[in-house]
From Swiss-Prot:
Catalytic activity: RNA(n) + a ribonucleoside 5'-triphosphate = RNA(n+1) + diphosphate
Molecular-function GO terms, alphabetical: DNA binding; DNA-directed RNA polymerase activity; protein dimerization activity
Stated name of the protein: DNA-directed RNA polymerase subunit Rpo11
Organism: Korarchaeum cryptofilum (strain OPF8)
Function: DNA-dependent RNA polymerase (RNAP) catalyzes the transcription of DNA into RNA using the four ribonucleoside triphosphates as substrates.
Similarity remark: Belongs to the archaeal Rpo11/eukaryotic RPB11/RPC19 RNA polymerase subunit family.
Length: 98
């Protein structure tokens, strides 16, 4: 995965992400849009045959878009770690009958 900040201003950031599309960006945008400090988050896949996406984030006045994005990524990683651990725990307790 390659990440390139295409544009950044006081309360907006646009990031080009190569090597990822909906699998990563859909949950990230959902996480971002759940935050009070976010006015809008969305993404676009400019061409269906290329694994490239553009993430757009606009935050409320006084917030830093880079920091809000980093925080959302951290929270998403924590959520997936919890889900992964719970899944592994459940699988470990299953008894397989042959």
């Amino acid at each position: 995965m390659e990440i390139e900040v295409v544009d950044v201003s006081r309360n907006e950031i646009r990031v080009l992400i190569r090597g990822e599309t909906h699998t990563l960006l859909s949950p990230l945008v959902e996480e971002l849009n759940s935050l009070d400090e976010v006015e809008f988050a969305g993404y676009d896949v400019p061409h269906p045959l290329k694994e490239e996406s553009v993430l757009f984030l606009r935050v409320k006045e006084g917030m830093n878009p880079r920091e809000v994005l980093k925080g959302a990524i951290r929270r998403l990683m924590e959520k997936y770690e919890i889900i992964g651990n719970s899944f592994i725990e459940e699988l470990s307790s299953l008894k397989v009958n042959h």
